[in-house]
Amino acid sequence: TLHRPSNVDEREVLDPIIRFLLDEVSKDLSIIWPIHPRTQKQLKTFGLWEELLAHPQMILLHPIGYHEMLRLNMDAQVMLTDSGGLQEECCVLGTPCLTLRWNTERPITLEENGGASILVGNNISRIREEYQNTLQKDRKPVRPELWDGATAKRCLEAILSY
């Protein structure tokens, strides 16, 4: 998914990302892309929309619900996104995540902190390098230490021991 102005508002930034998806990622994988309305608008403005629609490996979806997105995330080989929420979900589900941002408000999701996400910004060389590295890795859940599903139990134990 892409929706942040830093990725979609300037053709000079968006076009190389689209070229990477169409020319490189599509050789390895089908691309399923729920399109944010403002992203769709920009793709049309820049004359890229019809090319995406016509590409045989590109499946464009209208915005989808939470459960549908979770299902896609669970089945994904890799997630390319600029969404903070998807960074977290990738960690929980074990989906490798390339975050097309230069920073994140969710640093615990980053690979160096035990998460599944790598910040790649919108630099195509960096995106390409990390994408190729990701395809070589064994997929396994990578979760931060306390993201084990036992938070309620720990809270209850803390309350009872007080």
Regions of interest found by a model, annotated:
Residues 36:
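Conserved C-terminal portion of the radical SAM core fold
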Residues 1-31, 39-162:
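Nucleotide-activated sugar donor-binding and catalytic core shared by glycosyltransferases
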